Amino acid sequence: MSEAIKTDVLIIGAGPCGLFAVFELGLLDMKVHLVDILDKIGGQCAELYPEKPIYDIPGIPFVTGQGLTEALLEQIKPFNPNFHLNEMVESIEKIGDPGFRVTTDAGKVFECKIVVVSAGGGSFQPKRPPVPGIEAYENTSVFYAVRKMEQFRDREILIVGGGDSALDWTLNLHPLAKRITLLHRRDDFRAAPHSVEQMRKLVADGKMDLKIGQVTALEGADGQLSGAQVKGSDNAMSTVSCDTMLPFFGLTMKLGPVANWGLQLENNLVPVETASFETNVPGIFAIGDINTYPGKLKLILSGFHEGALMAQKAHRYVYPDKRLVFQYTTSSSSLQKKLGVN
């Protein structure tokens, strides 16, 4: 087990509600780390609708999901939060009163006084391609995310998909890989035009391969891939030599390991009391779309409100002997100093 990272608060989920919670906690002098299963900050806003307009953020008539994420990151910059992306929390163990030990699927361990679950509707899980026996190669030759690029140096990689993730990793891994083949079911891509243009230039220059078709079977033994059988658009069969496959077929929402954390659940949501949005486990809070209570509205602005009240209660756990004096950022010189505006 790796040495534990110690922090006041661990937030699970780096979407808008989790990001704004950093701001509210930071104003009250609490140190925060955030863990997210995605490879980017912003949650659903960044992953599902980065360019989609949002019209119901107070005081902002129009903003995109990406724009909101960038604004929140700028707002919390004074508090220097630490992000741990591409990691999923697997277990939460109570070790004090308050106090928790949290472990991720990457083997990282956190020790914190407070846990805030801000995981949207659960965790994003990669969609598995409908290829027989693919499970035998997962995490040895088949990967659904790139955590360390160096891991793929000198590999013969088959990247499957036609969206931004497939194109981005094709371009990013190209300098490291022995050879890259991009496979998509049609010669039409849903990625940024500039990325598609770069990819086609690499193909034209003979620096990578592009195939149109679908994987029907994998070849290899003992978890080590040696090739993939591909059915082309003309139904012709061929074999692509590869020792690594990266399928990017999008993500699906699942409750995931939240169900194993000892939290009360109601229709796959976490019930909370509305004074502080604490769960049935003292010291664990739930904000945003993951929680439920009478009158709940699944709106970003509701999650912001929940984060503000959560921080007030969290302060009592982190600083049990310190009296909390409520202050306004408009008039408090100490808060303005923390924000770097004084």
Curated annotation (Swiss-Prot):
Its EC number is 1.18.1.2. It comes from the Bacteria. Keywords: FAD, Flavoprotein, NADP, Oxidoreductase. It catalyses: 2 reduced [2Fe-2S]-[ferredoxin] + NADP(+) + H(+) = 2 oxidized [2Fe-2S]-[ferredoxin] + NADPH. SUPFAM superfamilies: FAD/NAD(P)-binding domain. Pfam families: Pyr_redox_2 (PF07992). FAD binds at C17, D36, Q44, Y49, V89, F124, D289, T330. It is an enzyme of class 1 (oxidoreductase). Its cofactor is FAD. Binds 1 FAD per subunit. GO terms for molecular function: ferredoxin-NADP+ reductase activity; flavin adenine dinucleotide binding; NADP binding. Belongs to the ferredoxin--NADP reductase type 2 family. HAMAP family: FENR2. Homodimer. This is Ferredoxin--NADP reductase. It comes from Nitrobacter hamburgensis (strain DSM 10229 / NCIMB 13809 / X14).
